[in-house]
A protein has these predicted regions:
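Feature recognizes metal-dependent phosphohydrolase scaffolds
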Residues: 1-255
Length: 255
């Protein structure tokens, strides 16, 4: 323009310098990020970052560097916060969900949770058990698993499910004001007949192999299960990235 006659040349020099210094890609990426930031003043996330699908830790890593956002907690987000705070029932539930949907990456790769003790326990306990009804739902899986690995995930799924039922019963007994007596499931099983009895109705069980359940005291953890719970608990409590991500969720809760 007549007011700033050198402006065009000035801009051309900037662009030429970006190109000659081989910073064109970096410049384009930076401009795209700037456009995103200016376009979205505040990002509102409608919960359940940790529900089923893979890569929850990747989303949280991205949010760590995001300028302005809030999270409307979903039940899965709250569950993970409970696990990160050391609640063993929540920990078992988180692992069970991961096994159910074949999503091990978030636990192992994302947060460094050691699942080897669970795998070893499951292989020993259910070595001759097909665990058919505990097959993972692969439509949400984070990888393509071979038959051997699928077999192992299935065994782990069954093992942690039984442990979860036992741990939940401890909480229900300790906090009767929750009114969750109906969620104590193992005591409703007639092990001799292989049926589940609820509100006067009987349901034939699709799986009757429960080697770690004592019918006389169904919620008592075996020594091996108790040791396993302690190892997994330690792993969750020592995951720095998990703590960081849960702290982020707490700080950025939506109003």
């Amino acid at each position: 323009s007549s007011i700033e006659p050198n402006k065009h040349a000035y801009i051309n020099v900037i662009i030429s310098t970006i190109i000659t210094t081989k910073r064109a890609d970096d410049f384009i990426i930076a401009m795209c990020n700037l456009i995103q930031r200016l376009t979205i003043d505040s990002l509102h996330i409608v919960g359940d970052i940790y529900d089923r699908g893979p890569g929850a830790h990747i989303i949280m890593d991205t949010l760590c560097n995001y300028h302005n956002f809030d999270i409307q907690w979903g039940n899965h987000d709250i569950l993970w916060m409970g696990a990160a705070s050391g609640n063993d029932s929540c920990i078992a539930n988180v692992i069970r969900m991961s096994m159910r949907y074949g999503n091990l990456g978030t636990l192992e790769d994302g947060y460094g949770i050691n699942l080897l003790p669970l795998a070893t326990f499951a292989m020993d306990t259910y070595a001759d058990d097909p665990c058919t009804i505990f097959m993972p739902k692969m439509n949400f899986a984070d990888a393509h698993y071979n038959e051997k690995t699928l077999r192992l995930i299935t065994q782990m799924h069954k093992a942690i499910t039984i442990i979860q039922f036992k741990l939940e019963a401890e909480i229900i007994d300790r906090r009767p004001e929750f009114g969750m007596e109906n969620r104590k499931l193992l005591e409703k099983i007639d092990f001799d007949r292989g049926v589940f009895v609820y509100e006067g109705k009987e349901y034939v069980l699709r799986d009757t192999n429960f080697p770690t359940v004592d019918p006389a005291n169904p919620y008592r953890l075996t020594e091996e299960e108790r040791e396993l719970v302690e190892k997994i608990h330690y792993s969750f409590m020592n995951s720095e990235k998990l703590k960081k991500h849960m702290r982020l969720s707490l700080i950025h809760i939506s109003e």
